[in-house]
Swiss-Prot record:
Signal peptide: none annotated. Keywords: Calcium, Metal-binding, tRNA processing. Ca(2+) binds at residues 12, 141-142. It comes from Thermococcus gammatolerans (strain DSM 15229 / JCM 11827 / EJ3). It comes from the Archaea. HAMAP family: Archease_arch. This is Protein archease. Gene3D superfamilies: Archease domain. Pfam families: Archease (PF01951).
C-alpha cells in the first residue's frame, strides 16, 4: 500500500513516500510532491501524460522522474492525483515509465498551497526498510 507524508525540514518541507514495492514508493513520493502544491484528493484524472526516464542510479531516477512531472506542471498547468510507475533494471542503470493522470490547476477547486520551484537532491534517500517496505524522500525547493 502506497502512502506519503510531509516532514519538517528547517525552512522547508520534506516529502516522504512509502510503498510495498519500489514503484509504489516512487508513486507515493510523486503524489506527496503534488500534495505540497494542492490537495491531491480533489484532483480528477481528466488528462494523462506518460513519462520515461533512464538514469544510472535510483536517486538520479527519482530526481529525473519528479523533474519531468514538475515540467508538465509548469508548462501545461497540470496537477496530478494518480501516478503509476514501472521501473526496470537496465544494462546501464534503471528505466522508469510512468503514467500520471490529473487535470489543469483550478484555483477554486484545488486550493493551491505552496509553489514548488524545483526538485533537489537535498535529503534524498531511497531505501528498503527492515519491514520490507520501500521509502523514498527528498526536499523540494519552495
Amino acid at each position: 500500500m502506497r502512502r506519503w507524508e510531509h516532514y519538517e525540514h528547517t525552512a522547508d518541507i520534506g516529502v516522504r513516500g512509502y510503498g510495498s514495492t519500489l514503484e509504489e514508493a516512487f508513486e507515493a513520493v510523486a503524489l506527496g510532491l503534488f500534495d505540497v502544491m494542492v490537495d491531491v484528493r480533489k484532483v480528477e484524472p481528466r488528462e494523462c501524460r506518460e513519462v520515461e526516464v533512464e538514469e544510472e542510479d535510483l536517486e538520479a531516477l527519482l530526481y529525473s522522474f519528479l523533474e519531468e512531472l514538475l515540467v508538465l506542471h509548469d508548462m501545461e498547468g497540470l496537477v496530478f492525483g494518480d501516478v503509476r510507475v514501472r521501473i526496470e533494471k537496465t544494462e546501464n542503470g534503471y528505466r522508469l515509465k510512468a503514467k500520471a493522470c490529473g487535470e489543469v490547476l483550478d484555483y477554486e477547486k484545488h486550493e493551491p498551497k505552496e509553489e514548488v520551484k524545483a526538485i533537489t537532491y537535498h535529503d534524498m534517500r531511497i531505501e528498503k526498510l527492515p519491514d520490507g517496505r520501500w521509502m523514498a524522500q527528498f526536499v523540494p525547493d519552495l
